[in-house]
Amino acid sequence: MTTPLIEIRQIYKSYGNTPILNNVSLNVNHGEFLTLLGPSGCGKTTLLRLISGFEQPTQGEIFINGQCVNQLPPQKRDVHTVFQSYALFPHLSVFENVAFALRCKKTSNQEIKERVFDALKLVQLELLAERNVKQLSGGQQQRVAIARAIINRPQVLLLDEPLSSLDYRLRKAMQSELKQLQKTLNMTFIFVTHDQEEALSMSDRIVVFNHGHIEQIGTPKAVYETPANLHVAMFIGEANIFDIQVHTVKDQDIVTNIEGIQLSCKNTGNYQVNEWLHLIVRPEDIRVWSLSEVEKTEGMLPGRIVDIIYKGSTVDLKVELSSGKIINASEFFDEDDDKLEYTLHETVWVQWLPGWEVLLPYEG
């Protein structure tokens, strides 16, 4: 069995009487891209600071390469941090910002030159080496911060929401570049974000935080398609949620009632008759049909379209059901497909196929 690079063992962290992290345990593997995901104030950045050594745990232990590092200062740990603010030296050039750590170690000028340009090539900034960092764009400044962090090839790179200040297009480009850089270096990245799309697109595994504890650890596919609880389901992407009661159990299915319509669902949790559950359907799994398209309406819910949002590649629909509940549906847009020419207040039928839903224990 492979020994994890980082082991977080039953970590607690409080500031005064305010608990921040509550019994957090986590292993981080060699060469993986791990994302700590959660809303603001959930403890993810605090955990990053504990790993880096900028904070000390109230209780628990942190191991790097099998060694407990609780008493080691940041400079003795083989980890580097890229901060949200980048923390560059504004009076220095790109080259000198990246070379700073090497000069502190009194590395020879020739070695500094070689290693700095190697790092700048990795982030595609070698042609801007002599430019002052104040003359760079936000994305370029971020690349300088990353080059400076990887100059000594640490085992772990910690990234604290480094993309949050970038515009959408640049943020998307940097997501791809960061993931490619991580693969090229075969370095462990621990990335902090509150952005679900970032986490899903970049990570090998995602750690979902909430109120100082871990809700779920898994691959992007696992946390999206099989959320551990209602918080994860609602935080990772959009979700339509129905509260249902199991009426009957038949073979591998359960039968329930939604909006007065009898529906069958896959019994994924060995649920029993009369048990209350949350039924979750993602917007992209909802199918919307005009009245003229439907002959048999078994297993479908009636509704009317109350909003249409065109997003280029998709059309998002808000459909009001007979109870007044509004659900979201998302369909890929095809300008040549007349079926997607919906009109506001149009009466429609909605459905999803058995097995496309997620069932979770009722949380009240």
Curated annotation (Swiss-Prot):
<dbReference type="InterPro" id="IPR005893">
    <property type="entry name" value="PotA-like"/>
</dbReference>
<dbReference type="InterPro" id="IPR027417">
    <property type="entry name" value="P-loop_NTPase"/>
</dbReference>
<dbReference type="InterPro" id="IPR003593">
    <property type="entry name" value="AAA+_ATPase"/>
</dbReference>
<dbReference type="InterPro" id="IPR017871">
    <property type="entry name" value="ABC_transporter-like_CS"/>
</dbReference>
<keyword id="KW-1003">Cell membrane</keyword>
<dbReference type="InterPro" id="IPR013611">
    <property type="entry name" value="Transp-assoc_OB_typ2"/>
</dbReference>
<dbReference type="GO" id="GO:0005524">
    <property type="term" value="F:ATP binding"/>
</dbReference>
<keyword id="KW-0997">Cell inner membrane</keyword>
<dbReference type="GO" id="GO:0016887">
    <property type="term" value="F:ATP hydrolysis activity"/>
</dbReference>
<feature type="binding site">
    <location>
        <begin position="38"/>
        <end position="45"/>
    </location>
    <ligand>
        <name>ATP</name>
    </ligand>
</feature>
<comment type="subunit">
    <text>The complex is composed of two ATP-binding proteins (PotA), two transmembrane proteins (PotB and PotC) and a solute-binding protein (PotD).</text>
</comment>
<dbReference type="InterPro" id="IPR050093">
    <property type="entry name" value="ABC_SmlMolc_Importer"/>
</dbReference>
<keyword id="KW-0547">Nucleotide-binding</keyword>
<dbReference type="GO" id="GO:0043190">
    <property type="term" value="C:ATP-binding cassette (ABC) transporter complex"/>
</dbReference>
<dbReference type="Pfam" id="PF00005">
    <property type="entry name" value="ABC_tran"/>
</dbReference>
<protein>
    <recommendedName>
        <fullName>Spermidine/putrescine import ATP-binding protein PotA</fullName>
        <ecNumber>7.6.2.11</ecNumber>
    </recommendedName>
</protein>
<dbReference type="InterPro" id="IPR003439">
    <property type="entry name" value="ABC_transporter-like_ATP-bd"/>
</dbReference>
<keyword id="KW-0067">ATP-binding</keyword>
<dbReference type="Pfam" id="PF08402">
    <property type="entry name" value="TOBE_2"/>
</dbReference>
<dbReference type="GO" id="GO:0015417">
    <property type="term" value="F:ABC-type polyamine transporter activity"/>
</dbReference>
<keyword id="KW-1278">Translocase</keyword>
<dbReference type="InterPro" id="IPR008995">
    <property type="entry name" value="Mo/tungstate-bd_C_term_dom"/>
</dbReference>
<feature type="domain" description="ABC transporter">
    <location>
        <begin position="6"/>
        <end position="236"/>
    </location>
</feature>
<keyword id="KW-0472">Membrane</keyword>
<comment type="similarity">
    <text>Belongs to the ABC transporter superfamily. Spermidine/putrescine importer (TC 3.A.1.11.1) family.</text>
</comment>
<comment type="function">
    <text>Part of the ABC transporter complex PotABCD involved in spermidine/putrescine import. Responsible for energy coupling to the transport system.</text>
</comment>
<keyword id="KW-0813">Transport</keyword>
